[in-house]
Amino acid sequence: MSTNEEKKNVLFGSENQPWQQIISDLGIDSELQVSPPEQDSCCTYDQIPGISCRDFQLSPKGLTPEQRQTALQQLHEYQSQQQKYFLGYQTNQKLDYEDDLKRYLNFFLNNLGDPFQSGNFTVNSKFMERAVLDYYAALWNARWPHDPKDPESYWGYVLTMGSSEGNLYGVWNARDYLSGKFLLDDPDAEEDAKQASRDDQPRSVPRRLIYQKTRPPQDNPNAFTPVAFYSEDTHYSIIKAMQVMEIKTFYELGTELYPDENPLAPGEQWSKEVPSENGSAGSGSIDIEKLVKLVEFFAAKGYPILVCFNYGTAFKGAYDDVERAGKALMPILEKYGLFERKVHYDPAHPGKYDIRNGFWFHVDGALGAAYMPFIEMAYNAGQIKHRRPNFDFRLPFVHSLVMSGHKWIGAPWPCGIYMTKTKFQLRPPDEPEYIGSPDTTFAGSRNGFSAMIFWDYLAKNSYKAQIEKALYTENFATHAYQKLLELQEKLQLDLWVEHTPLSLTIRFKQPNPDIVFKYSLSCETLYVYQEKRQYCHIFMMAQVNNQLIDELIADLSQRNAFPEQDTRISQPSNEIFVAKEAKKLLQIPHTGRGFK
């Protein structure tokens, strides 16, 4: 801990002045109004090549135009350099929005609340958002336009975050739907207002909504306890969403309540996640046969089922076969009364109930949902030999779907789309005395600029243009894969080169830190063939060209490109004792599995 005198003398800002001097020059009593730095943050934070930490520190005096320009020039040079060699993540760096949209940077555009309710905050782009949502509803085979009176029509919105927000919202929607919750008007709201008025306190009657949860039947205490399933290649945002929404996974329930009944390996520990095909060495797609066994175990005990599928996993770019999985699970759900069931919302009136599914299938299509429809079009036109399985609303068992806008499409910031059907929103029943309002977007304020970005991109790019772009990126993925295989042969070194069919990513042995930084490579530890391996991957997005791949291959050809790795799997050095009654908690990975 620094002394007060040391704190006051910490150098700060581009002029390298002591903090106390800066504060004193402004006539501020630093003891009462602002706290000094505990230490020099430029020595604490990561140092970025090409960036002067001092030039970016925000002095209480502000920055002069010259200082600001110096910092911004460094910023531009750094970002331009990193963008030029960007290969490691699934984001399109080839953007074209400046000419059309730069004039709107001085507008505060807020798509507040539901996109289908214009509202009184009129500086918004909801009319553009609705056009974007209709576009993707058509592309994903949903019924459109949105019609609140048509339960089969789509509902959705443009996300302010990436697909992480959509995954969280989808899991939230699924939890409330499966746990038998209803959104109702509070019948006491009007009575409260009447009572206040009798006391000469004029009071409006605000619409006050309450959540009500139905009670499970006596013969099935598990009827409204959802259990979640997702593969070991699932993005961590899904796993975090389960924790935030307090949804138990099959691993948690199995370990806690059925420790010796693991259907995949009786008597052995439960898997934390549904295994992927061939484990870490496989493509990354969910193992459907094992999923079916796990789901049937819990369906037989009356639990409603929540399955999160992937369509373009973050690290391997794998696609779950949603159609085959759904068809395999439907007979099980029908067998145990989970295909459709009555959900009563008024114990006093048995005739008041909803008919709901006892399952929810969510598709995380952060990457694949943006471009696979165009691969399908190319396949149908005979332009490509293969396509991936269906994943969208043509499958009657799909409840919700998310896609990121900053990945294959390309955007200056994270954004995305969440879509479901109107009938799956948490809505009040139809009887007048119970009418509330539909549950709507996750965030109140939403970035209106994101809808404009989507609209501008789609207005410039026809289906034909996007088919050409999809084929370009697919062909480049095959090209880069072959180049890495040739390098492996040339070096006579196993580089662990792997490529999931029709994915845009190629993974290989992690090179040295300089190469990782230059190309912004995403790295991850995988346990493969009884070895602990450090992998990295590259994504073939629209900005990638032959010159960039050739330069990467040249760098990887250098003698010190691939440091030796210790692939031995070490045992824990300290034995950890856990009390018998301690519960096993959900495991959330903090590294790897890409990003949203």
Identify the residue ranges that each predicted region occupies:
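Eukaryotic N-terminal low-complexity, Ser/Thr- and Lys/Arg-rich leader segments
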Residues: 1-70, 184-219, 256-263, 267, ...
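N-terminal entrance/gating region of PLP-dependent enzymes' catalytic architecture
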Residues: 2-154, 165, 533-539, 543, ...
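Conserved C-terminal alpha-helix-loop-beta "cap" of PLP-dependent enzymes
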Residues: 69-73, 77, 216, 239, ...
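A short small-residue
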Residues: 109-115, 309, 453-460
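Conserved aromatic-histidine-acidic binding/catalytic patches
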Residues: 116-124, 155-162, 226, 230, ...
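Short glycine/serine- and small hydrophobic-enriched flexible loop segments
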Residues: 137-138, 172-176, 455-460
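Surface-exposed helix-capping loop/turn segments at secondary-structure junctions
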Residues: 138-150, 180-186, 484-497
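Conserved PLP-enzyme active-site core in the AAT-like
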Residues: 153, 158, 162-169, 173-427
